[in-house]
Amino acid sequence: VMKKTMLRSLCYLLVVVLGLQLVSVWLFSNETEAAAENVQNGIQFKDTSGNIIHAHGGGILKVGSYYYWFGENRNADGTFNAVSCYRSSDLKTWEFRSNVLTKSSAAELNVSNIERPKVIYNSSTNKFVLWMHWENGVDYGQARTAVASSSTVDGTYTYQGSFRPLGYDSRDMTVFNDNGTAYLISATRVNADMNIYKLTPDFLGVDSLVQTLWVGQYREAPAMFKRNGVYFLVTSGATGWDPNQGKYATATSITGTWSGLSNFGDATTYDSQSAYVLPIEGSSSTTYLYMGDRWAGAWSGKVMESRYVWLPLSFPSSTSLSMSWGSNVSLDTSTGTVTASSPAIDTNAYYILENRNGGKALNVLNQGTADGDDLEQYIDSGWYSQQWKFVSAGSGYYKIMNRASGKLIGVESGSTADGAIIEQWADGGWTSQHWQIVDGGAGNFKLKNRATSKIIDISGASKANGGAAIQWTDNGGKNQQWRLLKVE
């Protein structure tokens, strides 16, 4: 009896141990699979409460296992509302923490403009220091830097004031902590030149001017990072809200000789402007993530309607970089692996068709559901009348079906003329309801009709709500290019 009892006990123990091992393996494998997160490019990100993330022109600081994202949170008129802070462990799921600086933090912030906020940590003073560009909210002539500090990364920051560094005007700027020595990089002389300053040991002030780069070349939106002993400085041109060719330079010492400027990305940096470059250090590699803003001002929108563009940088050599487009970015903060890709059309999903020129969504006029209702562009409002499914029509063509009405995009009366109205209609089996998706590069597409060989166009290159959708001969215009944003 004792032997049988002992045998049963041993069998029971073996089952428990094997069960625990299986559970352990299951948990580990699921944890590994869940590590990589997918981010869609060119959209407005949302936090864990479903609110739009307002962190434009900002930067990220990693503290412990969390990434803290600081950025601009503006009023509808573009003036300063707050510097908002979000945190995430995976760069996908963002929790709003607080508005670390607000318009009530100091008198000169009540009516002001605050741009490009960046936070660095001073290990000697145990302070988190926030630098930003300050203007008076009335004109754009003050051109000062401003500073605030806090003893906690996502707590309330105490405003220290604004000033011109060593008397120089300062607009677009960033700060960089080089292993305890910090630098301010800012556009000066009305953006004509780029100055690099060394900060004081407490990071609250400017100690000295290190050097002036690219005199008269009008560079802005600086972002500095260091890779394998080489410093990279990324900038954009100065063309207002409109995107332009991103460029970079390198040096082996911040205070030494910098290279000439070289291009990266395409001619518009994929319709974005640099804000920050984030090193993502993992168990197998370190990836450098370009973080850019797709400013809504380019389509006459409000600043807080702007989108985000994140892409991994590649390094052909120790002193060169490149950046390729991908509509989706896979982020694995555990391994440090970041990849960009552009998946094929998902015929089970719905998409928002966003016009490149107007920044607005293709919509059925008045959210109509009837045959013959015209199509227009309208700011993305979350309506089903702005969501479309691609249904294969064979031979590389698609029917594009509206989510609200179940009807297809077609050309009015099957007309072959330039200017013919684009409408919705029940599926009639006509080739005027068939569309080819033509790659326009950098995540932009043309929608070409099978019957007419013409492109869906927004009439007159309008950027306004209600701009009419028509067909027109392909002329390469941005108003004929569309972004396919998957509804998540």
Each model region followed by its residue ranges:
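Hydrophobic core
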Residues: 14, 18-22
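Composition- and surface-driven signal marking solvent-exposed, interaction-prone regions
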Residues: 1-5, 25, 247, 303, ...
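Bacterial N-terminal signal peptides that target proteins for export
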Residues: 2-14
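Carbohydrate-active catalytic/glycan-binding domains of CAZyme proteins
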Residues: 33-347
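Lectin-like carbohydrate-binding module/patch detector with strong preference for beta-trefoil
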Residues: 341-488
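Sec-dependent signal peptide cleavage junction
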Residues: 22-36
